[in-house]
């Protein structure tokens, strides 16, 4: 797990529990081998007509389209340079933050990070792992309300990242006792991953 790409997506900045847990985790690694991208502090463009057409354009690109493709290429290069992705994915209204979804929309590119074959889709990013730290106000793990786990497993697997470890910090809005237990459980899980 030597080279890490860290993706933070919480809008809460220094108050974010997912960011704090991720920071605690990455402190166990060589800081020279870590790239941190705070998607809330450095927002990415939303998938709209301009972005979609730029990522699918053939032939000569406009300056705006080229800027979008260059950004997408940079994000994909960050993944390729890493051994492990560490993703902070707090639950907002049962799903991931918009900021993380914007990143996904820019890295999921046909012919670049996945392709279609006669056997179905095939991810083109291989040999990578992902650790996903997901924080929730309530208790959702293994429940129908946990949309994050299957979604991120699916989208990461679609681009070829199939070794995915989830770390859950739950019940954070259910009082101090529950919150402290949820955070302690997540910290223990993360510590075990550094061993």
Swiss-Prot record:
Homodimer. Binds 1 FMN per subunit. Keywords: Flavoprotein, FMN, NAD, Oxidoreductase. It is an enzyme of class 1 (oxidoreductase). FMN binds at residues 10, 16-18, 91-94, 135-138. GO terms for molecular function: electron transfer activity; FMN binding; oxidoreductase activity, acting on NAD(P)H as acceptor; oxidoreductase activity, acting on NAD(P)H, quinone or similar compound as acceptor. The lineage of its organism: Bacteria, Pseudomonadati, Pseudomonadota, Gammaproteobacteria, Vibrionales. Its EC number is 1.6.5.-, 1.7.1.17. The keyword Flavoprotein applies. It holds the Pfam family Flavodoxin_2. Its cofactor is FMN. Belongs to the azoreductase type 1 family. It comes from the Bacteria. Quinone reductase that provides resistance to thiol-specific stress caused by electrophilic quinones. The keyword NAD applies. This is FMN-dependent NADH:quinone oxidoreductase. It catalyses: 2 a quinone + NADH + H(+) = 2 a 1,4-benzosemiquinone + NAD(+); N,N-dimethyl-1,4-phenylenediamine + anthranilate + 2 NAD(+) = 2-(4-dimethylaminophenyl)diazenylbenzoate + 2 NADH + 2 H(+).
